[in-house]
Amino acid sequence: MTLVLSMNRFCEPIVSEGAAEIAGYQTLWEADSYGGPSPPGPAQAPLQGDRGAGPPLAGSHYRGISNPITTSKITYFKRKYVEEEDFHPPLSSCSHKTISIFEERAHILYMSLEKLKFIDDPEVYLRRSVLINNLMKRIHGEIIMQNNWCFPACSFNGTSAQEWFMAQDCPYRKRPRMAKEECEKFHACCFYQECGGHYLNLPLSVNANVGSASTAASSPSASSSSSSSSSSPPLPLPSCSRQVDFDVGSASIYKSDGQIPANEIFVTNVRSLGVQEKAKLNDEKANDDTNRDGGPLSHEPVGNDLAFECKGQFYDYFETGYNERNNVNESWKKSLRKKEASPPSNKLCCSKGSKI
């Protein structure tokens, strides 16, 4: 609240209207301004009342500020600090200066060394900085790989899967978990990318002993949808359990794209069939058609009548913690119970997969 007083010398304040309070306030202001050690007292009130009616200080009207004794304390400080902050630097100094990358890096290193001087244990700080730097590099690499995958097209007659994995220098350096056979050769691989939590089926080459590889089989679940709309042949997307040998009858082979679900991915090894296995395939395929509640489906074996097995040792194969037993078809569950002695070990090694 601003107090406005007349500068007329003949206008004296009236005591009944609060002149004592005004004089006391002016005494407090004078003590704060001139550094008076003694606090204001009631005896000094009439003297300060006479002094407050004096003429304004010389030169104060040029700055737009009246006598600080007759002006309220808040208004005076507002004007004072506005005048002090009124100074603006020239526009030339406000222009953006371009700094090279080397100068910026040198400045960062210099500031880091200055900070290390005041740290009690620099080794802990350096270790933490290295961890943060590695994490940032890994995140950057994952972002790059999510936008543009660095895996080249790997044909069946090209480089083997093992040589391809060892030769590539990808920014994503996490060790892939693959299924190994006794002969230490990689037939197919399922790679888990943590960006988005998708399973990727990489186009790795199969064993050189196998002449031609066909697409793997899958049993569609109740809620399966069409996995791909392109004209390319479908990718292998069946499901399997850990360390279980499946017969060919437990899997059905399809050609159309709409019959392959995209919610399950697994790894298979390929071997040729004998004459007895071919007969067994035809018999059990007819039984599967009658048990399937979706009606008769047009499907036929593909390629050179190859069977697919889950054979070999699986090392910590994608333990995601999901349990997708409900998504498996009833006929598929029955065939698994026949082949497995212990039902609790019927755990899907791959689940929640999708193609990118």
UniProtKB/Swiss-Prot annotation:
Residues 215-232 have a biased composition (Low complexity). One of its GO terms (cellular component) is nucleus. Residues 33-53, 215-238, 280-302, 332-356 are annotated as: Disordered. PROSITE patterns: SERTA. Residues 280-292 have a biased composition (Basic and acidic residues). It comes from the Eukaryota. Residues 101-147 form the SERTA domain. This is SERTA domain-containing protein 4.
